[in-house]
Amino acid sequence: GQDTIRKYTIKRLEKFKAKNDYGTEYKSVLCVISEYLYVQDLSEDIFSFEKMLAEISDKIIIVAESPGTFCELGAFVMDEQCRNKTIVINEDKEEYKNSFITKGPVKMLENRDEQSVILHNGLEWLKFSSVYDDLINKVANETLKIHINNDSKQIHLKSLIYELANIIEIFQPLEFFEIEKLYKKIKDFDNYEILNTEGHKIRSIKKVLVLMERIGLVKKDKGYYIINKKISCYNIMFTISRKEFNDVRIKYINRMDKYQPQRMEIL
């Protein structure tokens, strides 16, 4: 279909790659479109769901192009945690200058950080904009911030997602109960409590895996979870080199091939 500013921005961000020690390329940025992901199993309403997505995201980019996106912008800007991550791409029109959106949410973002607001005159203008180009590069090259979970009573959802992705990448393919068992064993947790669950229903690793599947971090095949091949999280929870990762992986695959050869068909 025809490019929109949102589609074009996603395409630009997803072009950024990172190489491992062996030259294999992986995506540096995983873009998620919130309204395509919402299901009632994960949250009672879309605003609570989007707030949860904001919690697990490094950046929130809102292309203000419809009443729905204006509502999102207002909701995110009113929440301090979300506001600090939000970037808005808004059309630069004379009639918008005194609008509620411009004087309210956009102004709040500008007061916090002028670089978090980009005003444009259409897609073709953006394609040649150095300001937009700088924004894309800044977002794509920003260091991922993850605080490893050490307290079973205060599990941060974002950290948990990457920790589980790390486990899956090393030991895939895995069933749900194996992932949970490995996580508890590695962490030495008897149980765990996920923080900030007031607005959503993600209180278990099983639900976290549903979310991870919907955002494209993992996929499920014949009941087994495997990592998205375009993404790598092997060194989130463990401080190991790629060689050490490969050594562990080869030993595990050889054992799996010997005792459960049917699993090899999933890879």
Where are the regions that the model predicts?
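Short, amphipathic alpha-helical interaction segments positioned at domain boundaries
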Residues: K229-L267
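Cross-kingdom TIR/SEFIR domain
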Residues: A75-I118
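A short, conserved structural fragment
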Residues: L209-G223
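Long, low-complexity, charged/polar intrinsically disordered regions in eukaryotic proteins
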Residues: G104-H156
